[in-house]
Regions:
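Conserved active-site-proximal phosphate/metal-binding subdomains
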Residues: 72-103, 109-258
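Short His-Asn-centered micro-motif
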Residues: 41, 105-106
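Gly/Ser/Thr-rich loops at beta-strand to alpha-helix junctions
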Residues: 17, 108-109
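Active-site entrance/lid segments in N-terminal catalytic domains of soluble metabolic enzymes
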Residues: 1-96
Length: 258
């Protein structure tokens, strides 16, 4: 399948054993004659070093804890994580062909975030939460509306395992959880409501369709701390164009305040 339909990239995340990455990467490179880039998402400096030595990735996606959805329970924002990973990789003194490109993830939703990531040492960025608010995203309308509604993302979201427990998606490796917008399910768990009752209410909310989302709803809205920067729904191409131009403007006037 890989030989016939060769993907541009294979993106790995949260392996149970880091050593598995070496075997997977080797197989993909052999089958695709190295036409498929190997991307690995990491959340700590130690993980970045272990992954680099295990499979020589083409790209390290350095995910800070501001990211929505799943990631490391313990870590740092990209402000500290990206430069420390960059320094640690540089200290390995790898030849250029074995030095991974760094791509920043987590808390980036506009040109300012992109500009910051590039200055910190990333070569590119990936955005998740911002693209939830585009018509191309295959999510429920209620989910999308909640992403647009939410603000003050640092206070309105939390890293937790509650949503996985309610959804039955508890097979993540140790040390991972997910960041989502706070709702009644999270509040009830924090206030000591028995899990069985919280689960019953969650399952009832599933029958409400789009009305199941929202601050008084119970459906999960995975999103990062930059959710407050998402102001409306835009086409994916328009988001890319706007963010790219915003980054150019910020970088262009970066020296004015020095």
């Amino acid at each position: 399948m890989l030989a016939k339909y060769t993907p541009a990239a294979a993106w790995f995340f949260a392996p149970r054993k880091t050593d598995d990455l070496g075997r997977w990467a080797s197989t993909i490179r052999e089958v695709t004659q190295r036409r498929t880039s190997i991307w690995v998402q990491v959340g700590t400096v130690a993980e970045a070093l272990a992954v680099t030595q295990a499979c020589k990735p083409d790209v390290l996606v350095v995910q800070g804890t501001d990211a929505g959805g799943h990631g490391r329970e313990r870590g740092a924002s990209i402000v500290a994580l990206v430069p420390e990973v960059a320094d640690a990789i540089a200290a390995l003194s790898l030849p250029p062909e074995e030095t991974p490109a760094l791509v920043a993830a987590g808390g980036i939703a506009d040109g300012r975030g992109v500009a910051a990531a590039l200055v910190l040492g990333a070569e590119a960025v990936v955005m998740g939460t911002r693209f939830l608010a585009c018509p191309e995203a295959a999510i429920a309308a209620g989910y999308r509306a909640e992403v647009v509604r939410a603000s003050d993302g640092g206070a309105a979201t939390a890293r937790t395992k509650v949503y996985d427990q309610l959804r039955g998606t508890t097979d993540w490796p140790e040390g991972y959880n997910g960041r989502g917008v706070l709702n009644r399910s999270w509040e009830d768990a924090a206030n000591g409501v028995p899990f069985e009752e919280n689960k019953r209410l969650y399952e009832a909310a599933m029958e409400l369709g789009d009305a199941g989302w929202g601050p008084q709803g119970r459906m999960t809205t995975y999103a990062g701390t930059a959710v407050g920067l998402v102001k409306g729904v835009m086409a994916a191409r328009e988001i890319v164009d706007e963010v790219r131009e915003g980054a150019r403007q910020v970088l262009g006037r970066g020296g004015e305040k020095l």
